Amino acid sequence: MEQQKIPQATAKRLPLYYRFIQNLSLSGKQRVSSAELSEAVKVDSATIRRDFSYFGALGKKGYGYNVNYLLSFFRETLDQDDITRVALIGVGNLGTAFLHYNFTKNNNTKIEMAFDVSEEKVGTEIGGIPVYHLDELEERLSSDIQVAILTVPATVAQSVADRLAETNVHGILNFTPARLNVSENIRIHHIDLAVELQTLVYFLKNYPQ
């Protein structure tokens, strides 16, 4: 993505827009309004127009947005022509699910290797992805791998993150409950499924539709 000073909330919505625009293009649709986008991605149209305004004139009043132009724009903005190579650390139930999934709908993101300590898993392939011993982490991680998915037990998450900090990894998607401390040059996104579920239940009880 281009280094533009846009709000982080906007940046998080860009892949959502891109996915829907891809589907529109595949269906043969030539143009789309902000209202149609709003209905599809469940983001209000005013927010969509504001998000798009950070990138200049992407559409025309009374016409909407040209689908092919948007597709090309977001493809370039999100660096979809560059392959993002990913390593996964922790081949438990969640990690195994990731290996089988391997971002099949996102052709530019690929898990290329996994790490674990289980003798039953080390030396095997899961979903076509080789599983190495965690002791080989620094040796195996090449300069091409800049993103890691962390699905290890929370008790070892920080120590693994410390080791990743000594490699070329610049981004960690953390699925453990641990809140990690790393250097400023590494960006971490925390996804705690238990917290997400608790939040959903709270909203269901306190903000009924």
From Swiss-Prot:
The keyword Membrane appears for this protein: no
GO BP: any one term: response to redox state
Sequence positions that bind NAD(+): G90, V91, G92, N93, L94, G95
SMART domains: CoA_binding
InterPro entries for this protein: CoA-bd, NAD(P)-bd_dom_sf, Rex_DNA-bd_C_dom, Tscrpt_rep_Rex, WH-like_DNA-bd_sf, WH_DNA-bd_sf
Keyword field contains NAD: yes
Localization, UniProt: Cytoplasm
Alphabetically ordered keywords of this record: Cytoplasm, DNA-binding, NAD, Repressor, Transcription, Transcription regulation
SUPFAM superfamilies, sorted: NAD(P)-binding Rossmann-fold domains (SSF51735), Winged helix' DNA-binding domain (SSF46785)
DNA-binding region, residues: 16-55
GO MF annotation list: DNA binding; DNA-binding transcription factor activity
Pfam families documented for this protein: CoA_binding, Put_DNA-bind_N
Domain of life of the source: Bacteria
Function noted in UniProt: Modulates transcription in response to changes in cellular NADH/NAD(+) redox state.
Similarity-based family: Belongs to the transcriptional regulatory Rex family.
Subunit annotation: Homodimer.
PANTHER family, alphabetized: REDOX-SENSING TRANSCRIPTIONAL REPRESSOR REX (PTHR35786), REDOX-SENSING TRANSCRIPTIONAL REPRESSOR REX 1 (PTHR35786:SF1)
This protein's name: Redox-sensing transcriptional repressor Rex
Organism: Bacillus cereus (strain ZK / E33L)
Lineage: Bacteria, Bacillati, Bacillota, Bacilli, Bacillales
